[in-house]
Amino acid sequence: VCETFEVPYIHIGTDEVAFTNPEFVPEMVAYVRSKGKKVISWNPGWRYQPGEIDMTQLWSFRGKAQPGIPAVDSRFHYLNHFDTFGDIVALYNSRIYNQESGSEDIAGVILAVWNDRLVPDEKELISENHFYPNMLAMAERAWRGGGFQYFDGHGVILPEEDTPEFKAFADFEERMLWLKKHIFQGYPFAYVRQTNVKWKITEAFPNGGDLTRSFPPEQEWADVYYYEGRPYQVKEARGAGIYLRHVWGTLVPAFYPQPKENHTAYAYTWVYSPKTQEVGMWIEFQNYGRSEMDLPPLAGKWDYKGSRIWLNEQEVLPPQWTANHREKSNEIALGNENCVVRRPVLVVLQKGWNKVFMKLPVGRFSTDEVRLVKWMFTAVFVTPDGGEAVEGLIYSPDKIR
């Protein structure tokens, strides 16, 4: 390896293993150094003292930088788990290792694309992991420093419009979309504007494990609902993709501070169109991780949670899934489960206001079919080819133009 790769560093691992020989890791570090290379190792992993290793890579939330040992932060940076619209918010707004700038102890950052599951080609690898948008977000943060808190601070939800965090992300989004149009034309770049997309989302109603149970929002929209003697509030959210509960649970804050299993939420908005037009729609209720063996949805269903969506009172049905296997295997590639690798669902927007309504149940947060359930939704109108957002639309749950 040292002879083949003309690089200054060699990574020797040391994570997720039970150490039985206390001399093995120091011996391997010395051996690699004898070949003229510097050595990187995982943290958590082997416990080093300054001088015993040249750099550590922090791979989980338990990873901690040590004074005297340069560290690279890759905690929460696993693109193979990222969705299209939520995780990039946390990625851009977060400080690297929660520090304003680099130092002798904080060397930089790494984004990981760890597809344990078979990938058919490079284009799908880049598309499903939203590679270019996330790289641009991380590159700006790495070069310029700064940011706001960390992944476990504000999380994956866009903050209020008048906050510095929102203004910074909206500015970045504007510049990123310019790069998409002028620099990345022809490349798989799965992102459209989302800072203009507004929703109202209810508090979650307890469904007792019945994912089909109906609740008051299915009868009428209101600012507060009453069910079984208690009020259920409604709160506004922004974004084309909203995590109600993140894939890593409460480690990364999402819409609900303390989400619970066996609950049902509702999200809705009005969308103003200046004309009647056929458009595409990205719709997704379980963004499939690229390192999981999760099973594809059953025919005619969006997911295993019972998620449903209506446009102007007409239910929007899922596409025909290209994967229908019932055997879990990392050697079976994903089909068209994720919205960015399939043609958008074609729908018609009427001139004027259009009603979008979603029912979002959840049962267990880990099931036989899906190990890491993402309680979430993605819904945004795009051109029929999925290349751009539809121009001239206004997303407003209060019908404000």
Over which residues does each language-model region extend?
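Active-site neighborhood of glycoside hydrolase catalytic domains
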Residues: 1-55, 61-64
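Flexible loop/turn segments at secondary-structure boundaries
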Residues: 17-21, 46-50, 63-65, 79-82, ...
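Flexible, acidic glycine-rich loops studded with aromatic residues
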Residues: 60-196
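Short beta-strand segments enriched in hydrophobic/aromatic residues
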Residues: 113, 273, 285-287, 360-362
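Accessory carbohydrate-binding/adhesion or oligomerization-edge regions at the termini
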Residues: 170-260, 290, 321, 355, ...
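Short beta-strands within extracellular/lumenal beta-sheet-rich domains
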Residues: 259-273, 341-343
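A short beta-strand element within beta-rich, extracytoplasmic domains
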Residues: 275-301
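Beta-strand-rich ligand-recognition modules
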Residues: 294-296, 300-377
